[in-house]
């Protein structure tokens, strides 16, 4: 086996859980080897345990039969393998599965999307989101905290456990992971990067770097750091052809405008092999907001110096949202303009919208620390009083 191992400089502090045990899902391979060294064991023991954890989805040390009984007993005293639990499952008519995952006293959502030739898992990185993109349900829930490594990789582990571990079924239960669930991944680099390293590691889930995708709304300093830490596929949530529109629907644009964002994207592409020289542009289609043919021409001009493919995403509604979904005819005209400029343009097929599992619909259960939901409720009450 050709080893793919941790290369980043991030070392997340390993903190025992309340029961005093180390959750091994919090450790990448470098940390696992250090942990076993502290136990007086050889580094290869870490590799053996990781193989059981991720290839077999085992959380029981007694199942690890190539490890001696004394070491298994020692591990049970000081460590555990504890992934977050599924507390609710919903299945779509198209085969998509949405899991509500308990993280402490809150919930995040994880989505499994099976297709004929692949199975993609959409993973959350935060409880809620601080960025307030106006068309996204998650953003309306407010923000509470970053997820730990074990809570991020634990979503992949739990999904693989449910669908069937690779060594049990003989097939990969998950072929692609997209960091496109709840939260902005670049605002949680300390935990997201080690989790992605486990996804890529041969003794982890062994995914190709082209099959692990991080999506960002444009936290430019963190994007520059990412390029020095790990090489994964990159998707960017652009959603507008100019700063005027993006300032309104993606507020972080007021801090890092489109030009600044795309400059950072091009810097990342220069460092990356995973992207095959181009980035994926995500563009949600909002009726009569950003979906006119004039917007398509502006977008083509904007992206002329950025190697990319463009995903057009029909907007998925949620209660209280002030937008409408673009009609098929408007999306078609928009797409044809982009293709006339030579851009690879794909209209994303909506999956799981009947269970609110589609793009922009994930909500979870968030104890909002930003007071955003309270402000919105008070504003709503004020409007109602005025209307009366």
Curated annotation (Swiss-Prot):
One of its GO terms (cellular component) is cytoplasm. Keywords: 4Fe-4S, Cytoplasm, Disulfide bond, Iron, Iron-sulfur, Metal-binding, Methyltransferase, rRNA processing, S-adenosyl-L-methionine, Transferase, tRNA processing. Its EC number is 2.1.1.192. It is an enzyme of class 2 (transferase). CDD domains: Radical_SAM. Signal peptide: none annotated. S-adenosyl-L-methionine binds at residues 183-184, 215, 237-239, 316. Its cofactor is [4Fe-4S] cluster. One of its GO terms (molecular function) is rRNA binding. It comes from the Bacteria. Residues 115-354 form the Radical SAM core domain. It is found in: Cytoplasm. One of its GO terms (biological process) is rRNA base methylation. Reaction proceeds by a ping-pong mechanism involving intermediate methylation of a conserved cysteine residue. Belongs to the radical SAM superfamily. RlmN family. This is Dual-specificity RNA methyltransferase RlmN. It comes from Citrobacter koseri (strain ATCC BAA-895 / CDC 4225-83 / SGSC4696).
